[in-house]
Curated annotation (Swiss-Prot):
Protein name: Dihydrosphingosine 1-phosphate phosphatase YSR3
Compartments where found: Endoplasmic reticulum membrane
Function of the molecule: Dihydrosphingosine 1-phosphate phosphatase required for efficient ceramide synthesis from exogenous sphingoid bases. Involved in endocytosis and calcium-mediated signaling.
Listed EC numbers: 3.1.3.-
Keywords tagged on the record: Endoplasmic reticulum, Glycoprotein, Hydrolase, Lipid metabolism, Membrane, Sphingolipid metabolism, Transmembrane, Transmembrane helix
Membrane topology: Multi-pass membrane protein
Native source organism of the sequence: Saccharomyces cerevisiae (strain ATCC 204508 / S288c)
Hydrolase keyword on record: yes
Cytoplasmic side: 108-113, 177-182, 237-241, 341-379
Amino acid sequence: MTIIQTVTELGVTEDTIKVQMAPSGGKHLLADPGNHPAEHFESQMSWLRFQTRQYLTRFTDNQSDFVHSLQKKHRTPFRDVYFKYTSLMGSHMFYVIVLPMPVWLGYRDLTRDMIYVLGYSIYLSGYLKDYWCLPRPKSPPVDRITLSEYTTKEYGAPSSHSANATAVSLLFFWRICLSDTLVWPTKLLLLSLVIFYYLTLVFGRVYCGMHGMLDLFSGAAVGAICFFIRIWVVHALRNFQIGEHLWFPLLSVAWGLFILFNHVRPIDECPCFEDSVAFIGVVSGLDCSDWLTERYGWNLVCSRYASCGSKVFLRPLVGVASVIVWKDVISKTAVYTLLIKLLRFHDDRSEKVHFHNETSEEEECLLYSGVSKVEIVGRFLIYAGIPTTVFLLCPVFFTWTNLR
């Protein structure tokens, strides 16, 4: 089947094809995942998976027109810059730097809850993205306003930004409303800031041309589910002492690797699985850090501003530097030496790189080729080391530098 025949089935004229594939900034109509005709997916999906996708496409078929009309009506240079940069609040590096902050300021439990709701929101939204294989709003006609081309290569629904924003906003709502130390004027101010954060992040995904309404609503559902499950688990296990059970860290690591190696295979290349690996690694690293702390009775809780004064604000300088040193300097060499040199894992990374190098000149979105197994385990361990650094090592560094 030729490209002209394919896109004609999608309701695009030959003149439009020539415009959209023009040399000056044009791109292949099938460059982004999820835009192929139904036959492309039917032959590679189970009956239930394909029928689910077909049902949901009724909500995505016309999303590009809606998003394009919204952009035409509301775009301004200021809003472009505002929503482009505030989208970083849902980015990978933002979480790496910002999530540890409450720990260093004395609010350890807040970061713990945030890691759980964000980690499983990322995993579940990524799983459903790869299961449904639904497209983002088409560009063109939509303009994608983004700082990262990486995210444009993911499927659309559910929106991980929407899932994360919903989970975190519900968590803050819950904590603020139940707080015994905050007076109501302060609570109302904080709740207003949470609402502002939520609307900025969620509406920004539509404004930036990255998502349609199905993406946002399904993402919000994922985030709400993860929040309510977390609250239920905290209540159900409130008397559970993890330090008394040797199996707890082993189960956490085994569960994390199990759900990663049993993640659904997307039809087209989609990079969102990498974020799932990273966040599930962080969850397991948190579990192992908590287990060590409770089992051996280590007092690693950082003092708060009331008892330590303004020097608490110097902790992030030491903390962020420690995280960066682990993630960008030490981790890869240490982890892959452990896996390949000592544990004798088969290094299949070069096989995947070779495949991508051979096909990288193709303009059409590639079929999914799989992920290196040793890279899954390696990335899992690298990110498991981040909460270990934050929860176990940073308090020691703060003591050495008289910041604790």
